[in-house]
Amino acid sequence: LWQGEHPPEAPISAHRMQAVCYGHMLCVTRGLPAVDVRVVYVTRRGKVQGEFPERLTAEECRAEFQSVLLPYLRRIRAVRRHTRARNASLAALKFPYANYRPGQREMAVQVYTAIKRKKRLFACMPTGTGKSSATLFPALKALGEGLTGQVYYLTARTTQRQGALDALARLHQQTLHLWALVIDAKDKQCPTHTLCHPDYCERAKGHFLRDTEAIEEMMAADDWSAENVRAVADKYCLCPFEFAMSLCEIADVVICDYNYALDPAVHIRRIFDATRDVTLLIDEAHHLPERIRDMLSGSVDSAGLRKLRTVVGKAAGKKHPLYKAMTDVIRAVDSLLLPEDGSMEGTLPKLPDDF
């Protein structure tokens, strides 16, 4: 699908490589000595904007296909080496303090047992009793024993992460091999503050063509701090947030906000929409009901809709179906949200059936 203002002069490299991969598969499955591949760009209305045919031998297809797979093969091997080193270090891991505080050992045992048995655990402990260490330590031991694939430490606020970071820092003093990633809010990580689209941001343009080397550099490093992730992203001109999203697939521990695991709109789909063995350690879980209500609630602002309708009207005209539909929605919102007391805000217990 081509959405540019001018016809393409050459195929985008990723699109050409996709065609080459198809060509290789045809050569292998049908025993072809050569194959003709073609990248075609069309508009939404079906108008052809560019055609780029190419004839390749089976050997040329095979060589290019292998060149695409090679970085992923290196990544798999690196992850396996790291996993062996990580598990060995976790097997030797000791509790980071000489003695347990009251209740810490019991909590650690319950956390480990819950992970092993794939059960939920709701634990209450007073502030200052070392909950972060009492949950992370057994979770890491379970990770090293293959009882879980990843550990996600979820917090309600950024300030709450420090306890988990301090606990991990103390554990790292034991020569721990661990890829621990912190995910910050997307708007805080954005260095350009432009529209997140390849047409407007150089970091978004071709991001996934450049992130392979950056991921390899991170896998060779022990420092997965937010500062180092941003530094590597800058080095390769990557979007720091999308780079962190790629790293979370191979990270051992991820520290992030509730949203990235539980909010249907912004959760990490490549992790939580897939069948993965993930353990969630949810700090201050009593905040969850309010946060979940916010995640699942929606609001409609007729003033905002009017501004958007004005933009649509200038671009497409007042007779456009979208403009008319927005007018209908604005009228419906005004009629629904005007309480008897005359205030400009209202709350609906549920949406009307005909809304």
Task: Go through the PLM ranges and name each one.
Residues L1-A63, T135:
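Mg2+/Mn2+-dependent nuclease catalytic core
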Residues P33-V35, T148-G149, L176-W179, T275-V278:
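Short glycine-/polar-rich loops that comprise or flank the Walker A/P-loop
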Residues E59-A92, Y97:
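Polybasic (Lys/Arg-rich)
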Residues R81-C124:
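Conserved pre-motif I regulatory segment
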Residues N87-L90, K94, L147-V254, N259-L262, ...:
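A substrate-engagement module of RecA-like helicase motors
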Residues K116-P138:
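Walker A/P-loop
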Residues K119-A123, G149-V151, V253-C256, V278-L280:
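Generic beta-sheet signal
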Residues T135, K141, Q162, D166, ...:
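Signature of the SF2 helicase/ATPase Hel1-core->accessory helical subdomain module
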